Amino acid sequence: MGDWSALGKLLDKVQAYSTAGGKVWLSVLFIFRILLLGTAVESAWGDEQSAFRCNTQQPGCENVCYDKSFPISHVRFWVLQIIFVSVPTLLYLAHVFYVMRKEEKLNKKEEELKVAQTDGVNVEMHLKQIEIKKFKYGIEEHGKVKMRGGLLRTYIISILFKSVFEVAFLLIQWYIYGFSLSAVYTCKRDPCPHQVDCFLSRPTEKTIFIIFMLVVSLVSLALNIIELFYVFFKGVKDRVKGRSDPYHATTGPLSPSKDCGSPKYAYFNGCSSPTAPLSPMSPPGYKLVTGDRNNSSCRNYNKQASEQNWANYSAEQNRMGQAGSTISNSHAQPFDFPDDSQNAKKVAAGHELQPLAIVDQRPSSRASSRASSRPRPDDLEI
């Protein structure tokens, strides 16, 4: 027969995108069909017409009797069977190549969007859409293609068509030949003058090969049915698993992420904290009574108290004249208070500081005590 290398290379690529049952089916196809057909079976049927003899001298009688007994050669019939049962697998391979081509386009587009993202362009929605498309096509990391969606449907359809072709060819073979060969065939057909007997060479050997190919066809059909049930139950299992842990819940393509890592501090001004009512370092049993954070008087108090605190601190440092004892900027901590209309303005320019986590229990200095005891015209009455 002809060269099977082209078909073999194509079918070999399917193994990377098939299930375990599909790989076994391909092994059976390669070893017990293509290899056996190209070596032993072809030599056994090589002289089928030349060794076909009839007990008549009438010209043309042997030809018409051979045509009646064997409308198509067994070898050519099995070649057609292999081609037909391989076509659905090749169509599935074409779908895999289509998905891989889609993957290349999506990866290229994703790289372009990431380059635009580095320039400050907001492309988060487009990147999420690309992730959804990859999931839809069954594309995973490192170029791996998972059987999902349209690819899974194509695979199931290919299994169904392979099974149908196997059954159809078995029925056709049984209708034309049966599953055994006789040593003598009786023929009565023009131009034969009368009923003649025709003799077949090596009928027992050919019958053994026919039975062997029949068993291989039945094994392939059984593998197709088993694989069909396996893919069906695996799809149901993945669907149930997907409902319990859906894709959008794990990736969240359109839902904004929540920032749960913000620090929580206590505010000792009678107003509520923007993040938490109590400091994580507060002693056990400690409770802080806070006011309503939406209260306008509370917000005004926050701003005025912050300005007054910094004014008192600057005046105290100026009176002391001790530049070496000035607290470094890394240890200074302003107060941060919520504002529903807009973010709180920075009080000290160039210093982005954090709110106090705990109350400083150190005693006040003597200069600070004298400075704080003097009344100032701009002091707040609290």
From Swiss-Prot:
One of its GO terms (molecular function) is protein tyrosine kinase binding. Residues 264-382 are annotated as: Interaction with UBQLN4. There is a cross-link at K144, K237 (Glycyl lysine isopeptide (Lys-Gly) (interchain with G-Cter in SUMO)). The modification Phosphoserine is found at S5, S255, S257, S262, S306, S314, S325, S328, S330, S341, S365, S368, S369, S373. Residues 317-382 are annotated as: Disordered. The modification Phosphothreonine is found at T275, T326. Its main location: membrane. Disulfide bonds join C54-C192, C187-C198. The modification S-nitrosocysteine is found at C271. It is a multi-pass membrane protein. GO terms for cellular component: apical plasma membrane; cell junction; cell-cell junction; connexin complex; contractile muscle fiber; cytoplasm; cytosol; endoplasmic reticulum. One of its GO terms (biological process) is regulation of ventricular cardiac muscle cell membrane depolarization. Phosphorylation at Ser-325, Ser-328 and Ser-330 by CK1 modulates gap junction assembly. Phosphorylated at Ser-368 by PRKCG; phosphorylation induces disassembly of gap junction plaques and inhibition of gap junction activity. Phosphorylation at Ser-368 by PRKCD triggers its internalization into small vesicles leading to proteasome-mediated degradation. Sumoylated with SUMO1, SUMO2 and SUMO3, which may regulate the level of functional Cx43 gap junctions at the plasma membrane. May be desumoylated by SENP1 or SENP2. Residues 45-76, 177-207 are extracellular. Pfam families: Connexin (PF00029), Connexin43 (PF03508). Residues 2-23, 98-155, 229-382 are cytoplasmic. Keywords: Acetylation, Cell junction, Cell membrane, Disulfide bond, Endoplasmic reticulum, Gap junction, Isopeptide bond, Membrane, Phosphoprotein, S-nitrosylation, Transmembrane, Transmembrane helix, Ubl conjugation. The keyword Transmembrane helix applies. A connexon is composed of a hexamer of connexins. Interacts with CSNK1D. Interacts with RIC1/CIP150. Interacts (via C-terminus) with TJP1. Interacts (via C-terminus) with SRC (via SH3 domain). Interacts (not ubiquitinated) with UBQLN4 (via UBA domain). Interacts with CNST. Interacts with SGSM3. Interacts with NOV. Interacts with TMEM65. Interacts with ANK3/ANKG and PKP2. This is Gap junction alpha-1 protein. The gene is Gja1.
